[in-house]
Amino acid sequence: MLPEPHRLRRHSDFSLTVRRGRRMGRRDLVVHAFDRAQADELVSSGGPRFGLVVSKAVGPAVIRHRVARRLRHICIDLVDSVPRGTDVVIRALPGAATASSRDLEKQLRAGLLRLDLLAPVSNST
């Protein structure tokens, strides 16, 4: 489970991130990111917060919950990598139902990288 300080809970936080944040689409995901320091709110501290949107278009409840669990697990690994004060909303597209966890992680990391929220990983050995 994603720790409470790293979860988006309020509808207003979701809508602010989706409407005013930057967006990057991937094959099975759309990643929205918003820097809370840009908002009129005084709350710009704290770690990154993640929110998930998995609609009925993804599939029946069992599939939607499986996709949400996979994405939540990926977000736990990204908490220390995403800058503090950033809100991230991940919207699953219908293709996410058949995507593997590895594919979802690659797509999410690629989206965050394109939004300049992750440092590129060097493959020097």
Swiss-Prot record:
GO biological-process terms attached to the record: tRNA 5'-leader removal
Keyword Translocase: no
Sample GO molecular function, one term: 3'-tRNA processing endoribonuclease activity
GO cellular component, one term: ribonuclease P complex
InterPro entries: Ribosomal_Su5_D2-typ_SF (IPR020568), Ribsml_uS5_D2-typ_fold_subgr (IPR014721), RNase_P (IPR000100), RNase_P_CS (IPR020539)
Coiled-coil intervals, chain numbering: none
Superkingdom of source: Bacteria
Keyword Cytoplasm annotated: no
EC category name: hydrolase
UniProt EC number: 3.1.26.5
Keywords: Endonuclease, Hydrolase, Nuclease, RNA-binding, tRNA processing
Catalytic activity: Endonucleolytic cleavage of RNA, removing 5'-extranucleotides from tRNA precursor
NCBIfam families for this protein: rnpA
Family listed: Belongs to the RnpA family.
Stated role: RNaseP catalyzes the removal of the 5'-leader sequence from pre-tRNA to produce the mature 5'-terminus. It can also cleave other RNA substrates such as 4.5S RNA. The protein component plays an auxiliary but essential role in vivo by binding to the 5'-leader sequence and broadening the substrate specificity of the ribozyme.
Subunit structure: Consists of a catalytic RNA component (M1 or rnpB) and a protein subunit.
Name this protein carries in UniProt: Ribonuclease P protein component
Lineage of origin: Bacteria, Bacillati, Actinomycetota, Actinomycetes, Mycobacteriales
